[in-house]
């Protein structure tokens, strides 16, 4: 799991650097957009659905892709102030009115009222955040938890079997990472 920690740290640094360049930011988002939209096509959520994305990062590519293509109300959180400031700037540049970016920790943020909660790949410790979701989110809430997927052979496999969450599906993204879809019992 130490390699996963180093990977996450490196990705945060790269995103902060890329976020300083409009060209690199737009490239980063464009490269991921189709993958994100395919991943989220599994959810049949109404137009007024509320989505919480934990760990939005300096370049909130998942948020941008979803907000441009869905009518969901999206809240992105990150505990890193610099990442929050960068993400807010990018959301403003895209002119997205259905997005709020807040500085918050997944272990403390209010989880009520969301139809879908996304746990980003870089969230640590993922199992503790999922345990909290299993206790505090509304029943019927979907959870999409990003995982190392094919890279688990390198980073190690995470134990993400959590009481109170029913596993719906394991999904393999085109970039080699994966996601596990849960529903809160």
What are these regions (language model features)?
Residues 73-78:
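Conserved SAM-binding motif I beta-strand of class I
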Residues 48-58:
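Conserved class I S-adenosyl-L-methionine
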């Amino acid at each position: 799991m130490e390699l996963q920690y180093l990977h996450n740290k490196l990705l945060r640094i790269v995103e902060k650097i890329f976020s300083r360049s409009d060209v690199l930011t737009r490239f980063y988002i464009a490269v991921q957009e189709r993958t994100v939209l395919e991943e989220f096509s599994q959810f049949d959520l109404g137009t007024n659905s509320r989505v919480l994305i934990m760990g939005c990062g300096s370049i909130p590519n998942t948020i941008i892709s979803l907000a441009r293509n869905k009518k969901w109300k999206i809240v992105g959180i990150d505990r890193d102030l610099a990442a929050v400031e960068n993400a807010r700037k990018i959301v403003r540049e895209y002119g997205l009115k259905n997005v709020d970016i807040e500085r918050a920790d997944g272990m403390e943020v209010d989880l009520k009222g969301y139809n879908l909660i996304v746990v980003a790949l870089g969230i640590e410790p993922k199992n503790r955040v999922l345990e909290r979701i299993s206790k505090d989110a509304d029943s019927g809430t979907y959870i999409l938890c990003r995982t190392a997927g094919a890279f688990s052979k390198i980073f190690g496999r995470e134990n993400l079997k959590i009481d109170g969450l029913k596993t719906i599906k394991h999904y393999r993204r085109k970039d080699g990472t994966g996601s596990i879809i849960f529903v809160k019992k």
